Swiss-Prot record:
NADP(+) binds at K38. This is 4-hydroxy-tetrahydrodipicolinate reductase. Its main location: cytoplasm. One of its GO terms (molecular function) is NAD binding. It comes from the Bacteria.
Length: 258
């Protein structure tokens, strides 16, 4: 099988570094480009760091992006022109940016996920099923913990779980979005979905969804111990996307969760 030419955008970040390591150990990929938003005179794995340009991505089959929203949109403009596939692991998009991603997906295959872990995506699926099975008596909230360097909150994964709750009720997450707390020891339930984000230490990721009727509490949770589970998932997504038609895909499509 011919190796897939891979570009990693956001290569100096935590996920970027892990992706470089994982891709070097994966026989399906050949690392062809490493980029950052600003020019940096440096080589990693024998590859000179570059900025996001058409020339940089010319020989690439698929781009894995772990950057920031405005950078992701710049990458999508280039990828759309070159007809390159993009795996988006970036989080923190607003509604307007989400709409632009959907627009780009009409011309190129895009897989977007706030979390590339099999376990987290299974948790999201179970969250939706649970939400669908419970009546309005049950209130829900989402709790997440990440390392102190993570800036956005709630995390992309927490929002995925919130979407799972909303989807279970056949409602839009933005209409069910409750309060967003940061570094609170405890936080309340509400008629809408409340989120609490903790930022401390070097924690890779912990997520918990809770449903409460006042008579009982149902908890669904996931804890990550190794960042490689995310990079391995991103590479699996990149390989899967190679033979796909233009469209906006998720890990749920890849894992065939219905």
């Amino acid at each position: 099988m011919k190796k897939i030419n891979l570009a990693i955008s956001g290569c100096l970040g935590r996920m970027g570094q892990q992706l470089i390591k994982s891709s070097k150990n994966n026989k399906n990929f050949k690392l062809t480009a490493l980029t950052e938003n600003k020019a940096i005179s440096k080589k990693i794995a024998g590859i000179k760091l570059d900025v996001n340009t058409e020339q940089t991505f010319k020989k690439t089959d698929v781009i894995i992006d772990f950057t920031v929203p405005n950078c992701t949109l710049d990458i999508l403009k280039i990828a759309s022109k070159l007809k390159k596939r993009v795996v988006i692991g970036t989080t923190g998009f607003n509604q307007k940016e989400e709409a632009l991603i959907k627009k780009f997906s009409k011309t190129i295959p895009i897989l977007k996920a706030g979390n590339m872990s099999l376990g987290v995506n299974l948790l999201m699926y179970l969250t939706e099923i649970t939400s669908k099975s419970l009546n309005e008596e049950y209130l829900s909230k989402v709790f997440e913990v990440h390392h102190k360097h993570k800036k956005d909150y709630p995390s992309g994964t927490a929002l995925m779980l919130g979407k799972g709750i909303a989807d279970g009720k056949n409602k839009n997450l933005y209409n069910l979005m409750g309060k967003k707390f940061l570094n609170k020891k405890s936080f309340p339930y509400g008629k809408k979905i409340n989120f609490n984000s903790i930022r401390k230490g070097e924690i890779i990721g912990e997520h918990e969804v809770t449903f409460s009727s006042g008579k009982e509490i149902i908890k669904l949770n996931h804890e990550a111990f190794d960042r490689a589970l995310y990079s391995d998932g991103a590479l699996t997504a990149a390989k899967w996307l190679i033979n796909k038609k233009p469209g906006l895909y998720s890990m749920r499509d890849l894992l065939n969760f219905r």
